[in-house]
């Protein structure tokens, strides 16, 4: 509303438009804010919406920095370091990356001097992050939590989990990307080093939250490409199966899982009315996650079912080891 009002006043006074730069850490953020602004402007007048469409730019951006949710321990550490209590303080890793589409209507600061990467199209960078970083993070979160690992750096101390994450990134996610002029092997190795940072104490439970909102971009989009190409994706299958096992609500030690997800009520209903043998087909009925296509694809259903049965039979850690042999 504020953006629309500001643009309305500038148009009324014959002032030039400005660039709306979204800093929200969501996919396709430029188009999201553009659609919101145009939708609200259209309710005021078609002329205003048309003027915004013609004169305002909405560059997409991608940010990358691992920032775990604050805990009592992290807040206490910060208090000791600073000598003051700050309830809003957060811990984060040293690495930082900001990629911005170079599409500004009235000039811009020379942000590249400070390390910002100005690009023509942010989508390839966004896909690289979502599939290689976030996808492997989710893989480690679901399977690591099931195996008893509370933090991502603990997963990295397990050679099998580390190798699985690396193969997932390079063998199964990287081939689905269209980014150029990036050394994806070096990128994958840098991600593994970042994941191994013991100071972050990034909880697998936190990363596993809201999986229904994350799974499509992080894993399922890549799987669809493999299905089209008839290429192998055993670790992606295990990742999806790991999510299914996780939302079923019990880890490998028999402990209850506090599943936090907008669809958790649906998960509970499915778990209450399905056996392990029926669990995959029951969860695949969630079209808001899997769409209409994947549940009807026999190759997809067979791969996820096999991976899920492997998890039930062997447990998460041994299932990772066995999947590496495929």
Where are these regions (language model features)?
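Substrate/ligand-engaging "lid" and interaction regions
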Residues: 1-326
């Amino acid at each position: 509303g504020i953006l629309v009002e500001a643009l309305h006043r500038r148009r009324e006074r014959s002032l030039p438009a400005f660039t709306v730069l979204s800093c929200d850490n969501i996919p396709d953020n430029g188009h999201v804010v553009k659609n919101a602004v145009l939708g609200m402007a259209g309710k005021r007048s078609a002329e205003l919406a048309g003027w915004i469409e013609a004169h305002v730019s909405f560059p997409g951006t991608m940010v990358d920095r691992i920032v775990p949710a604050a805990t009592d321990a992290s807040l206490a550490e910060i208090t000791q370091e600073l000598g003051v209590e700050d309830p809003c303080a957060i811990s984060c890793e040293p690495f930082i990356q900001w990629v911005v589409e170079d599409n500004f209507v009235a000039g811009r600061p020379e942000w590249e001097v400070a390390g910002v990467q100005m690009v023509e199209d942010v989508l390839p960078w966004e896909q690289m992050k979502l599939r290689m970083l976030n996808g492997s993070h989710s893989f480690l979160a679901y399977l690591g939590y099931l195996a008893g690992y509370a933090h991502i750096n603990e997963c990295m101390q397990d050679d099998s989990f580390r190798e699985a994450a690396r193969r997932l990134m390079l063998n199964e996610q990287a081939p689905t990307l269209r980014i150029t002029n990036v050394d994806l092997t070096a990128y994958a190795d840098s991600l593994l080093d970042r994941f191994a940072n013991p100071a972050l104490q990034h909880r697998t439970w936190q990363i596993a939250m809201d999986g229904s909102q994350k799974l499509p971009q992080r894993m399922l989009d890549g799987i669809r490409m493999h299905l089209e190409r008839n290429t192998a994706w055993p670790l992606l299958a295990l990742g999806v199966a790991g999510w299914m096992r996780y939302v079923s609500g019990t880890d490998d030690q028999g402990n209850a899982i506090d599943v936090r997800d907008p669809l958790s009520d649906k998960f509970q209903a499915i778990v209450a009315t399905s056996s392990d043998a029926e669990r995959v087909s029951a969860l695949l009925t969630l079209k808001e996650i899997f769409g209409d296509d994947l549940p009807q694809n026999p190759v997809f259903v067979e791969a996820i079912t096999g991976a899920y049965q492997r998890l039930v039979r062997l447990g998460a850690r041994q299932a990772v080891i066995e999947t590496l042999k495929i």
